[in-house]
UniProtKB/Swiss-Prot annotation:
The lineage of its organism: Eukaryota, Metazoa, Ecdysozoa, Arthropoda, Hexapoda. Detected in the thoracic perisympathetic organs in larvae, and the dorsal ganglionic sheath in adults (at protein level). The modification Phenylalanine amide is found at residue 11. One of its GO terms (biological process) is neuropeptide signaling pathway. This is FMRFamide-3. It is found in: Secreted.
Length: 11
């Protein structure tokens, strides 16, 4: 995961 923001968007 590049950035946490994107990670949260995934879920």
């Amino acid at each position: 995961s590049a950035n946490t923001k994107n990670d949260f968007m995934r879920f």
